[in-house]
């Protein structure tokens, strides 16, 4: 009996020790999983601050909206307001990166926050495609033309296609005639560089 009792005590101690180890490891894993979320939130906040201060690269990253975080409805409304403002500023400074973000087919390519402010209309995508085409050359120009043909077929309305071309011509002459020639798709957000610049913000 005493032997059995001793074995029971040993067993209970082992079980308790195992439970404590499980709890400890669970806590460590929980803390580890929280670290990326904290860093991502800090990145979101720092990019937003830099964008509001006029950093063009930060504005592109902010508009692109590839943030793996959950935010409140109020924060999302603020993102939308800021992103629309940064889009307008990007167009006014002739920033091809902003145009390229808006030229993506939102049903296929856009994820993250950008889908909340980017139009899902083929006519708007075509406008941005045609604007890019004014600055494009070589294989990239051919790529844009192919996409434009597909968009025109989806629209099925020559008047809308003509309107998109006219808008793109006017916008190019107004803001983009001095922008660099495009031999390939413009780079969007240089996320790695921004991460390096804002680790402690």
Kindly give the residue locations of the regions a language model identified.
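Secreted/processed peptides and extracellular or luminal domains of membrane proteins
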Residues: 17, 38, 64, 194-197
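TPR/TPR-like (Sel1-like) alpha-helical repeat modules
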Residues: 84, 116-141, 166-169
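Terminal, low-structured helical/coil segments at or just beyond the last alpha-helical repeat
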Residues: 136-201
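Hydrophobic/aromatic side-chain positions at a characteristic register within alpha-helices
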Residues: 35, 50-51, 75, 90-91, ...
